[in-house]
Amino acid sequence: MRAAVVGVTGYSGTELFRILSNHPEIEEINLYAREKEGISKRFLNKEVSAFRNIKNELLPYDAKEIMERNDVVFFAVPAGVTSKLAAPFIQNDFPVIDLSGDFRLKDPKEYEKWYKKPAAPKEELEASCYGLADFYKPDTSYIANPGCYATATILGIAPLLLKHLIKLDSLIVDAKSGVSGSGKKLTENSHYPVINENALLYKINSHQHVPEILQQLKKFDSEIEALQFSTTLIPVTRGIMATIYAKPKDADGFSLETLKKAYAEVYHGKKCVRVLEEGFPQIKDVQYSNYCDIGVAYDELSKTISVVSVIDNLVKGAAGQAVQNMNDYFGLDELCGLPKVPAWP
């Protein structure tokens, strides 16, 4: 197979290149800049110092050439880009895995409200599918890869809704992300003197992944209307920890065993989700892997459920899940080419 990557020089793009380079079914990777014309020759080893031995040229963007030369294309670009570029791929039913947020929300008004950018045409949004790989196989050729916070949060909450265990108005999510989740571009919050030995709460109840999370949770339980969602930047390079709190629907008949059974049943056979029998996961447990690790607890005194969900934001939260979606689309084993052992320590 031949794969194209548009936007390889960002953090998600470089992670994607790393994974695809070790994929046994990928024989050729072609790299494209976002610009169509007027760019001087650019080479990956000059753009990303870690890839100094990689001589691939970044080619000017050309949708026709991408489709003629490749079997699949990955877009690892910021929001607001693929909404303008998707049309020829959708018209030709060409496989796309889009790591941006442009096709995750099905309501154009919701996208424009949360992303502050023009939305893709509604007919194009309807031609795409949401690639939550541990629950769905792609049913269209245009796959919207889930966001990092959304992935950790949805996987952490799913059994609570699918098993109808909680009071829907009690859901609280406290999510924390490493600095790579903010992207490659330097901001004041990601500046070393600011984030080092610090924790920064940002976008409380206004993060663009909130409507994405709710859109998916409604598929698990259509009666859910809202959740309390906060995001904190922490001084680690990669990783997300989502701590989820909720109240059981029937506290009198609820127990920790009820909770454990629900998670074991929902995630039975799902290769990329690991439910701990005891204790809680830590970010280090999943770094450089495509796993989501989950631990649960129940406090009988306060009648409160606690769930901890951790992922690597650049792998399971971006490039790894994108490759998992590609594997599913082409009928490969979903773990094909994905790192099966996390890095430790």
Language model features with spans:
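N-terminal Rossmann-like NAD(P) cofactor-binding subdomain of oxidoreductases
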Residues: 1-197, 202, 297-300, 344-345
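Generic secondary-structure signature for well-ordered alpha-helical cores
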Residues: 21-25, 162-166, 207, 215-222, ...
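Predominant activation on well-ordered alpha-helical scaffold segments within soluble catalytic domains
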Residues: 17, 154-158, 210-214, 264, ...
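C-terminal active-site/capping subdomain that shapes the small-molecule cofactor and substrate pocket
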Residues: 242-345
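Short, solvent-exposed beta-strand edge segments and adjacent coil->beta transition regions
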Residues: 139-140, 197-199, 239-243, 306
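Conserved active-site and cofactor/substrate-binding residues in soluble primary-metabolism enzymes
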Residues: 11, 80, 127, 148-155, ...
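Oxyanion-binding "anion nests"
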Residues: 206-229, 233-237, 241-243
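Short Gly/Pro-enriched turn/cap motifs at secondary-structure boundaries
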Residues: 201-205, 233-235, 282-286
